[in-house]
Amino acid sequence: MKTILRPFTLLSRSIFLALFVLFLWSPDAHAMHIMEGFLPPSWSLFWWVLTLPFLVVGFRSLRKIVDANPRMKLLLAMAGAFAFVLSSLKIPSVTGSCSHPTGVGLGAVLFGPSVMSVLGVIVLLFQALLLAHGGLTTLGANAFSMAIAGPFVSYGIYRLMVMSKAPEWLAVFLAAAIGDLMTYVVTSLQLALAFPSVTGGIAASLGKFMTIFALTQVPLAISEGILTVMVFSAIREYASELFPASGTLAKEGV
């Protein structure tokens, strides 16, 4: 059990260090995470129920990676801190809302989506408790969009590009960018399901929510893709001995 918790300790330290930076610069805007108490209780419970099985699988994958190579704990913590910092940067939107990167693509590519789901939930929990981003009742919904849907789409895109013999930088870029966008698509769907339009129903609400975030999220996704490629390349160069010939542990960490 101690072996499993060690990466969480490193992740906690990394997150607390990042908090100092975020508290020094924090724009006056609400984070894109669904805020505490915003969803009806039935929908909050629904998303929690969908999220829990992924966490169980994620814990098993995480334990498998740590047991195989304890030196991976530092990179696991770094992947979590990367997601924490990026998803805490709130960018105001001209539509009156705000958007932010997610940072989950890096961990999904390196370790697989199941592991990133656990790291993502930890990130969201810290943000809810320490930064008032999101909330505890909506943690299941936020986790499903950012810690599950985003990483699984990122992983799927990455594997698809690798199998098609695409350049690695392109595979990582598309994985991070499309995974970021998918997080917002799922969040928009969650809001549309909970608050359907009186006239157009769920479809109208979905279009409205997606339009609100599209103006800022598309350029943010591109920027996140570029940054993720840079960080991934640095990891491959300076920590290549920790990874198999494929360059990632994604297959082992699914």
From Swiss-Prot:
It is a multi-pass membrane protein. Its main location: membrane. InterPro entries: CbiM, CbiM/NikMN. GO terms for molecular function: cobalt ion transmembrane transporter activity. It is found in: Cell inner membrane. Pathway: Cofactor biosynthesis; adenosylcobalamin biosynthesis. GO terms for cellular component: ATP-binding cassette (ABC) transporter complex. Keywords: Cell inner membrane, Cell membrane, Cobalamin biosynthesis, Cobalt, Cobalt transport, Ion transport, Membrane, Signal, Transmembrane, Transmembrane helix, Transport. GO terms for biological process: cobalamin biosynthetic process. The chain crosses the membrane at residues 37-57, 74-94, 106-126, 128-148, 169-189, 212-232. NCBIfam families: cbiM, PRK08319.1. PANTHER family: COBALT TRANSPORT PROTEIN CBIM (PTHR43627:SF1), PTHR43627. Part of the energy-coupling factor (ECF) transporter complex CbiMNOQ involved in cobalt import. Forms an energy-coupling factor (ECF) transporter complex composed of an ATP-binding protein (A component, CbiO), a transmembrane protein (T component, CbiQ) and 2 possible substrate-capture proteins (S components, CbiM and CbiN) of unknown stoichimetry. This is Cobalt transport protein CbiM. It comes from Chlorobium limicola (strain DSM 245 / NBRC 103803 / 6330).
